[in-house]
């Protein structure tokens, strides 16, 4: 009988007769095999099987891999052809792990004889079926590895860069260090320099007392600078450099008194007068921090409260204005909010926020000198927004109306403002007749035709350059 397991033959005549009658179990061997126990004693390749025993196939041999090539092959395994054997050997070599310099260094540094990880092969390692054996070098090699391990086990040296400079307060003008080198900023330094004038240089190391001026020299320098400022014999660049140098010396020596705040306030006003909003903002932040010191008298406190509100209006930081108002109430300084001028400044910020430009422009005339210097930095943009609102509300307006709303002194000044906005072609002459029959010529602005131009001008002027402050 032919079946999937090979050629099976009956051993005896009785067995053949029994099989012709259906066998001892009533089944014919000519039928397909239902289960292994149906067979009597059978022969498979001259090997006898006991009856009712399941004939089993030879177990499959393990896959040919790089670590069992030298093992004895099963006699039942078919020997591959010579050409196929060469290709198999080539594939086996490809599967072997590659040796890298890093892996070699790792394996050479291992204190042991056997590594079971086949992905790391050491320099001079010997392959085996169980793993890879590392051959250690001589005494020179061991000494070299020891020095290498010590070098990598050491912490970062003092000369390497670190992340300490992340702790620097770069919002402060007098940041002590611009590099990773740090020192204790709480060490009290007493200056010994007797030179009045000194240019500002950012500190990159510990301050040298021989290059720092003591308070008495700084007071003399302050009087010298004020004389030059009032006589207008010095440029703003020179004044700014000298004031920054004075502020640095005060900061390094940790001097916080009435003279310190006077230096910062004077520099802030001069910076406003010259349109230097960057230096003003640095001085203003330091002034507000000094006012929190209870030993310092709050002279001109309300003045710099107004400056802080106007600067927040410039940057459109209205939450800071609300926070400042709440802080004054919590600190028991609510009497400052009762001051008429301070109250007007806070109302001015509210009107700008809601877009009440009529009130905004009328109260602009009530501002003080340095307050106007601060608000002038963004006044042209507010005028442009106000003019856009007017043009969306009317089809045409008289230039006298524009003159009164924008606080211009004459029609010529109004016309110059419109010409700066590229609206010259929209200024028209119109003849009107009054109730007495008298005719006169007036200038009007065709607001309906200039709306698109105004919107384009607004988009171009939306960004304000205040030296990196916005």
Swiss-Prot record:
Gene Ontology CC terms, in alphabetical order: euchromatin; nucleus
Organism whose genome encodes this protein: Saccharomyces cerevisiae (strain ATCC 204508 / S288c)
Subcellular location: Nucleus
Protein name (Swiss-Prot/TrEMBL): Protein THP3
Keyword NAD: no
Main location: nucleus
Remaining remarks: Present with 3360 molecules/cell in log phase SD medium.
Gene3D superfamilies registered for this protein in UniProt: 1.25.40.990
Superkingdom assignment: Eukaryota
Chain positions with N-acetylmethionine modification: 1
Keyword Protein transport: no
Similarity remark: Belongs to the THP3 family.
PCI domain segment(s): 276-450
Pfam families: SAC3_GANP (PF03399)
Purpose of the protein: Forms a complex with CSN12 that is recruited to transcribed genes and required for transcription elongation. May also be involved in pre-mRNA splicing.
């Amino acid at each position: 009988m032919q079946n999937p397991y090979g050629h099976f033959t009956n051993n005896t005549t009785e067995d053949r007769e029994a099989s012709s009658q259906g066998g001892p179990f009533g089944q014919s061997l000519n039928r397909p095999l239902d289960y292994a126990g149906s067979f009597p004693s059978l022969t498979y390749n001259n090997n006898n099987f006991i009856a009712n025993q399941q004939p089993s196939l030879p177990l499959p041999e393990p896959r040919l891999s790089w670590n069992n090539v030298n093992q004895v092959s099963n006699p039942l395994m078919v020997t591959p052809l010579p050409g196929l054997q060469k290709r198999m050997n080539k594939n086996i070599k490809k599967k072997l792990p590659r040796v890298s310099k890093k892996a070699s260094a790792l394996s050479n540094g291992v204190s042991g004889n056997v590594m079971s990880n086949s992905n790391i092969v050491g320099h001079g390692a010997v392959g085996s079926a169980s793993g890879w054996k590392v051959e250690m070098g001589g005494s020179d090699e061991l000494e070299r590895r020891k020095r290498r391990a010590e070098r990598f086990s050491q912490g970062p040296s003092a000369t390497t860069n670190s992340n300490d400079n992340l702790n620097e307060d770069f919002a402060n003008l007098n940041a002590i260090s611009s590099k990773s080198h740090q020192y204790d900023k709480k060490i009290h330094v007493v200056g010994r320099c007797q030179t009045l004038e000194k240019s500002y240089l950012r500190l990159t190391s510990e301050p040298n007392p021989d290059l720092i001026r003591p308070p008495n020299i700084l007071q003399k320098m302050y009087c010298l600078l004020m004389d030059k400022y009032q006589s207008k014999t010095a440029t703003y660049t020179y004044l700014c450099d000298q004031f920054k140098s004075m502020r640095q010396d005060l900061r390094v020596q940790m001097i916080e008194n009435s003279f310190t705040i006077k230096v910062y306030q004077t520099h802030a006003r001069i910076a406003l007068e010259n349109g230097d909003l960057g230096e003003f903002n640095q001085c203003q932040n330091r002034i507000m921090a000094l006012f929190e010191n209870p030993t310092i008298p709050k002279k001109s406190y309300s003045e710099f409260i107004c400056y802080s509100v106007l600067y927040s209006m410039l940057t459109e930081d209205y939450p800071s204005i609300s926070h400042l108002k709440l802080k004054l109430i919590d600190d028991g300084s609510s009497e400052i909010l009762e001051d008429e001028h301070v109250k007007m400044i806070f109302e001015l910020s509210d009107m700008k926020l809601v877009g009440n430009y009529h009130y905004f422009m009328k109260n602009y005339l009530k501002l003080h000198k340095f307050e106007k210097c601060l608000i002038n930095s963004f006044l042209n943009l507010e005028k442009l927004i106000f003019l856009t609102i007017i043009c969306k509300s009317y089809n045409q307006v008289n230039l006298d109306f524009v003159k009164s709303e924008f606080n211009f002194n004459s029609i010529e000044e109004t016309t110059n403002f419109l010409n700066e906005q590229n609206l010259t072609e929209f200024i028209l002459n119109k003849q009107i007749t009054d109730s007495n029959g008298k005719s006169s010529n007036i200038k009007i602005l065709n607001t309906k035709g200039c709306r698109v131009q105004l919107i384009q001008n607004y988009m171009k002027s939306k960004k304000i350059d205040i030296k990196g402050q916005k």
